[in-house]
Amino acid sequence: MVELRILKNRDDWLKNRTRIGGSDAAAIVGMNPYMSNVELWEIKTGITTQRDISEEPYVKYGTEAEQHLRELFKLDFPEYEMHYAENNMWTNDKYPFSHASLDGWLIDQDGRMGIWECKTTNIIKSMQKEKWRDRIPDNYYIQLLHYFMVTEFEFAILKAQLKSEFNGDVYIQTKHYKIERADVEEDIKYLADAESKFWEQVQKKTRPALLLPEI
């Protein structure tokens, strides 16, 4: 059974983030460029504590931009019904090791439920922009698979704002990516198995073999 809880405040939400979240998932399968699966395991087992990045400028920008990007999406895509609640947390008793907190959730014209995710990124190098060319970067794709797994929704839409600066001018490019659950069922199953194995390693305090992302 899928359950949605709305926690009373951010502190309560943080206290309840005791399982595997969407931003953790890519590290488990070695696709997070910022954290390895071993580093995540050390955090989940209490060996180390997770660094608080909430005051980093890029994180604050993304957090403050989110509500505006959500409203823009509603204007640009009125065929979708947008829903959002602050401090939302989804759980699924099929996957007791995981939870999901969504940027939004959608209902399409056929009544299907969907995930809405937004990303803001500052493009400094051409290689960063290349990762968004006709595809979603691996770590964000894995995050969406995690959300599919927990929510059992039928589709996902990711809105990406790519920001770059040149000669004092700011350039903004917006991209939208849609994924149908039916097209990624095998990947969802693969991730669910990987998360289950990882959580067993956390509970037994068995250090996993190091997985590194491809450069």
Protein language model features and the residues they cover:
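Nucleic-acid nuclease catalytic cores
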Residues: 76-102, 106-199
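Charged, glycine-rich intrinsically disordered N-terminal tails and low-complexity linkers that flank
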Residues: 1-64
